[in-house]
Amino acid sequence: MGTALITGGSRGIGAQTVRAFAKKGWRTAFFYHASEAAAQALAAATGAFAIRCDVSDSQSVKQACAEALRVLSHIDVLINNAGIAQQKLFTDITDDDWQRMLGVNLSGAFYASREVLPGMISRRYGRIINVGSIWGQVGASCEVHYSAAKAGLIGLTKALAKEVAPSGVTVNCICPGVIETDMLGSFSPGDLAVLADETPVGRLGTPEDVAEAILWLADEKSAFITGQVVGVNGGFGE
């Protein structure tokens, strides 16, 4: 198998993606920001390389990508998964809220892709997989800044896919629906039950559901797929 770099890899979807790639034999590195203990435990369990990085800071991303290239030698697959969420009325969103949301959820993918792409282009092979959200497709009340950032990530995916396809690089976006991660920590059991009822398959999604879709897009069998937005949502919002 090849090499993979996963941003936001210490918890939730990212951590499960690290586990899935490592289990398949990929040499894997992942970025984490604040979750030091979780990152080190995951690295010990999987053999993946844990690298501290603030994806909203271009210099931090530059340094972290250089470290990833040092330990992996090259990067075949980049998974831009790092993300944050926040629920707020639109009129209560501060400048800092807005900048932080776009910095992590959108700029982080731009910075990491910019660092990794030259190597992919020179080798004429690469996979970039962005992790968006259903809210980037349909919008979410009280999450305007989050929805806007994820919609931007979809736009980045579609435009970059066209630009780098002649160089052998594919770019796609996974858009999860309601997934059981700590991002749902503010939801009551009743709220979660309602969301499960509103999902046609009758349950919430799991990080494993998303990780398997990411693995599929990383596989050589998906070589003719680029510029696509793939919903992993159990029919929710469709």
At which residue positions do the language-model features occur?
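Residue(s) in the substrate-gating loop at a strand-loop-helix junction
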Residues: 133
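Active-site helix of classical SDR
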Residues: 113, 149, 157
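Alpha-helical segment proximal to the catalytic Tyr-Lys
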Residues: 118, 162-163, 223
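Conserved glycine-rich Rossmann-like NAD(P)H-binding loop of the short-chain dehydrogenase/reductase
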Residues: 24-40
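Catalytic Tyr-X3-Lys loop
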Residues: 84, 91-110, 125, 129, ...
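Substrate-binding pocket helix/loop in short-chain dehydrogenase/reductase
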Residues: 89-90, 97-102, 184, 191, ...
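Short, small/polar-rich loop/turn modules that mediate ligand/substrate recognition or access, typified
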Residues: 165, 170, 225-227
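Conserved glycine-rich cofactor-binding loop
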Residues: 10-11
